[in-house]
Amino acid sequence: APAVKYLLKNQLVDQDHLARLPGQGAQVCGGGACCSPEINESLRKAGTTSLGEVVRSTALSLHSALTSHRDTFYGVVESALANSEHRALNVFQATYPRLAPAARQVLHDLYSALRVGLTDTDDRALENAMGTFWDDLFPPVYHSVLHARLAPFSRRYTECLRDAQRVVQPWGIVPTLVGEPLLRGLHSARLLLHSLDVGAQVVKTASNFAVPSECGDAAARMQYCGACHGTLAPPCPGMCLNVARGCLAPLAEVDGAWADLAGAVSRVQQSLQAVRLAQLLHQLPDKLSEAVMVALERGPQLQKKVRRDCSNPTHDDTSHSMYHLPVFTVEGVAAAAAASAGEERGSGRVLESAGAAVRAVDAGREWWAGLPDTHCNNL
């Protein structure tokens, strides 16, 4: 009979069991082809598995989408940072060739710290990266401007210059003009990445949802008892939804928190649209160059302020120069030129990938609320 074949196909009964019918103890389906204790247990497990599987399979699909969008967005922002770094090296080499070798490592450290700051748990990691950059840039700039023909500064004097930078303020208001909008954009990107990570972790946890034991009997009665009595009629839709909603109720409670997450992600997207992060990163090299120019123009004033805080300079008495760093390469110039041409495309990619991530989070809202319907539609 078709019903018996269905039971055999789903491994709810086997031929040996059928040969022993009729049996005793049909607690789940009340007799028929399923009346034995071992089949009752098999039915309970099958009912529990049926409910759990719809959660696992759909959760893993949503988890994959969230992590994919997260990785794509990070890749786009990281690419914008890399392009900005290449362009910064080009600008410094063209504008300050004497300073460029020493500035190269300082610039590299800045962009590396910004990349790390995008995913750092420390809320002030990005601000610290910018502050450290201005501290580190001052010693080579001051050496290049006032003492270019002398030996490198001693380590102690270099540290004094780093500490004095925030008092001397050699860059004028450029750090504020550069830092505030750039940090807003980077913090928005960081918040989006964090939100996607949180969403993916919540969904991953949900994929391991343990179906309550009492739901095994209800799911089995709904899905398999008809076959036990010789019919393959599908379960009543109303009964199916009632069982699924009751058994999956703990997951539905997440819907409210997920709505809050979706709202936060949407606001982050709006912030990214306002600040135009890729454009800010493209303009950053010019702003850094402008800061150095401000320091150059203030050379005599800087010297007075520095000597007040650090006295006369002391120099390294060895032939090793702490500013001797790898020279700027032709390949780097070419890469920077290509990066400049891609500014507009970079802005579009950041916003496009952010929008796709927001849509994925919105889709998650439907997932939490729609699990019972998904389960019943799959039967």
Label each region the model flagged.
Residues 130, 167, 254, 363-364:
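Acidic, low-complexity intrinsically disordered regions
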Residues 1-48, 55, 66, 255-379:
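Eukaryotic terminal intrinsically disordered regions
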Residues 161-168, 180:
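Hydrophobic, helix-prone linear segments
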Residues 1-161, 350, 357, 373-374, ...:
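Eukaryotic N-terminal, low-complexity and coiled-coil-prone scaffolding/targeting segments
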Residues 91-98, 111-152, 176-277, 289, ...:
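Extended amphipathic alpha-helical scaffold segments
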Residues 80-84, 104, 166, 173, ...:
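Membrane-targeting and insertion segments and their boundary/processing signals
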